[in-house]
């Protein structure tokens, strides 16, 4: 039982990860490193990028992707890859933590179906802005936002990185509960040394 284990095994999922560097990719990378350094074990599932070799202290499962960089700035993953789902399931995570409400959360839900473990979703940014930038036509934009909110609503717990992010999520039609879980920093507390 995950609640009685001293250390958890966590599956982190996101639609961006190095070589793509953005705020969410950095957050996922930091989560994985910190968990792996002593809080438990972690596996990261992300879309494949041509020519990328991963060398981290934790396993990275890359799944098939297609180039959508001109549209959204990164590659879109195919979340139904049997090989990737098998590899992530074999890790036997106690919890799945998705950081993107699109393909990563679809994959998280497929994995939850197999493993019967909870999915936590973190809403990092205002995805409606990205949708409106990538998709023309109000009806298509509204449909995409509704699908995004439905995907988020299917998660067992929803975190937002700020009260403003939570308000944005509500404005999109999300009616469920959420917890404000601010992104952490790894600087020591207290006065900054003069060095």
Stretch-by-stretch model annotation:
Residues 48, 164, 184:
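Carbohydrate-associated surface elements
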Residues 10, 95, 112-130, 159:
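Active-site proximal beta-strand in glycosyltransferases
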Residues 118-120, 128-150, 187, 192:
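Nucleotide-sugar donor phosphate/pyrophosphate-binding loop at the beta->alpha transition
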Residues 69-98, 103-110, 114, 142, ...:
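An amphipathic, basic-hydrophobic alpha-helix
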Residues 100, 125, 162-163:
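Helix N-cap/beta->alpha junction signal
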Residues 1-62:
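N-terminal subdomain of nucleotide-sugar transferases
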Residues 153-162, 179:
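A short beta-strand/loop micro-motif in the catalytic core of glycosyltransferases
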